[in-house]
A protein has these predicted regions:
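N-proximal low-complexity "stem/linker" segments adjacent to membrane-targeting elements
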Residues: 41-76
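A conserved acidic beta->alpha catalytic loop
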Residues: 94-102
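Conserved N-terminal segment of class I S-adenosyl-L-methionine
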Residues: 1-10, 21-51, 275-367, 373, ...
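A short beta-strand submotif of the Rossmann-like class I SAM-dependent methyltransferase core
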Residues: 376-379
Length: 497
């Protein structure tokens, strides 16, 4: 978390105090701001009274005619949980068993939940809805997941938002028929490489989750593909996934309920849907992954922007990146603070090791003159042409400090052509959210009127302009934001050259 010396209430600029590590409070008017996943948020409403979980851990076991296995597995689970120590509940989600599963579950004191939606995915959703624990562990009811491994998952709960018992990391193994092993490897390779996922075992059902995360997910999959969907949606939301080595053993009795044709169709459907998500700007790591994109133009653009901005910011001590997203720029300078309005992008950016703030360019939660360098790249074109954002950027910058401001130059035919082309070739990766079209001719004089001296303007791809500006002091702008907005409307109406 950034130091309280730099953070202030965005409403009144009053000082803040920390309370129990979960919120900040304004000392002037008592406004409360939550700390979410270690990130101070000035967007999310102040925290409500904490709703305590019903227990520390919920175990969720989907079951369909697994009575014989459950009669052996449930006592082993209870024994392992008692030795582990946390308060717990065991939930068995029954998909309409006809082998006495219900009686066996009641005999061993577990909670029985009747499945309403079809398939393995429906069982998961039913279990997640009923789970009362702070953490949830899912495992199979057929005995293939060793209850003794619960302690390993529980011990790793602080290492990730999701912890996977992984067969495919060093130290893991899988005892299964050769055909099934080959299919599992093909499945994991297809999803892992096809979707650029930083996970080795995507199909393991033996996992630990923070239950708060599960409540955020809008799951669609109905079969075993729900396992991949959960992980991909978790990663898209910026959460961390951790794997611990696990030795998988074959089911003790009975037969698998997977059906090959239905299995293949459901996985194909989920792969297509998740490919669209992974390659859209909605994915938390979109900015970061673009740096290494397989698309040459995207890779060139990201690296050109990174190089230009980091060179301009080098040597600065107190740096703020407004609208940092998940770009690698936030990790380029030690001690830099990143601010963005999208919390899931900030969750991903935690890996860069710098301080992060969930806030808005319209109300920056920092004291006047806090920074000797402020970066604002690819932001102002997404918001109306108003005075407030530019005033805020100037306010938090020290006199003599540098503002690095990047935005497309809509006077350049290259940008208009690229925007048109990219929007059609990769509609998921480009959102037509540019509501203000700036040009060098209208933005330069406006910034000078705001008290900035233009030190230079660099271009990425001959069309994205990056201003290097020195703050001289406050001035009354002869060019108003309204006139810039009028100019950009005229630009939008003009045909591309």
């Amino acid at each position: 978390m950034p130091t309280l010396d730099s953070l202030v209430c965005p409403k009144c600029h009053g000082p803040l105090t920390a309370h129990a590590g979960r919120e900040l409070r304004c000392t002037r008017d008592g406004v409360r701001y939550p700390v979410v996943d270690g990130i101070p948020s000035f967007i999310i409403p102040g925290p409500d009274p904490v709703a305590l979980p019903g227990c520390a851990l919920s175990l969720v076991l989907p079951a369909l005619n697994e009575g014989e296995n459950l009669d052996r597995v449930l006592p082993e689970l209870k024994q392992a949980l008692v030795a582990l120590g946390p308060t717990y509940e065991i939930i068995v989600v029954d998909g309409g068993s006809r082998d006495g599963t219900q009686e066996i579950v009641r005999k061993h004191g577990a909670r029985l939940v009747s499945q309403k939606l079809p398939g393995f995915g429906g069982a998961y959703r039913a279990g997640f809805e009923q789970a009362r624990g702070e953490y949830v562990i899912t495992l199979d009811a057929d005995g293939s997941h060793d209850p003794k491994f619960l302690k390993d998952l529980w011990a790793a709960r602080r290492d990730g938002d999701v912890v996977i018992a992984s067969r495919y990391v060093q130290g893991g193994a899988a005892e299964m028929p050769a055909t099934r092993r080959v299919m599992s490897r093909i499945l994991n390779t297809t999803f892992g490489r096809g979707l650029s996922l930083p996970v080795h075992d995507l199909s393991s059902g033996y996992r630990l989750y923070r239950s708060a995360i599960l409540r955020e997910l809008e799951l669609k999959a109905t079969d075993f593909d729900v396992l991949e969907e959960i992980l991909i949606r978790v990663l898209a939301a910026g959460y961390r996934v951790h794997e611990v080595p696990f030795r998988y053993r074959a089911r003790v009795s009975g037969r698998s309920h997977a059906r090959l044709v239905r299995f293949a169709i459901s996985y194909l459907r989920t792969f297509v849907a998740m490919w669209r998500l992974r390659n859209s700007i909605a994915s938390s790591d979109y900015d970061g992954r673009a740096y290494d994109s397989v698309i040459p133009l995207q890779r060139y653009w990201q690296r050109g922007r990174y190089r230009a901005i980091t060179q301009l910011a080098s040597g600065s001590h107190d740096v703020l990146d407004v609208g940092c997203g998940s770009s690698r720029i936030i990790g380029a300078i030690p001690g830099m603070i990143g601010l963005d309005i999208q919390l899931h992008k900030l969750r991903y950016a935690r890996r860069y090791g710098n301080a992060l703030v969930h806030g808005s360019i319209f109300e920056l939660p920092f004291a006047n003159g806090s920074f000797d360098c402020v970066i604002c790249s690819e932001v102002v074109e997404h918001i109306p042409a108003l005075e407030k954002p530019f005033d805020e950027l100037a306010r938090v910058l020290k006199t003599g400090g540098r503002l690095i401001l990047g935005t497309p130059d809509y006077d350049r035919w290259r940008w208009r052509a690229l925007e048109w082309l990219y929007g059609r070739l990769s509609p998921g990766g480009y959102a037509d959210e540019h509501i203000t079209h700036y040009t060098r001719a209208n933005l330069g004089p406006y910034l000078q009127g705001k008290g900035f001296a233009i030190e230079g303007v660099e271009y990425v791809g001959g069309s994205e302009m990056i201003f290097s500006l020195k703050k001289l002091g406050p001035m009354v702008s002869p060019v108003s934001a309204r006139s810039v907005q009028t100019a950009h409307r005229a630009d939008r109406a003009a045909p591309a050259a």
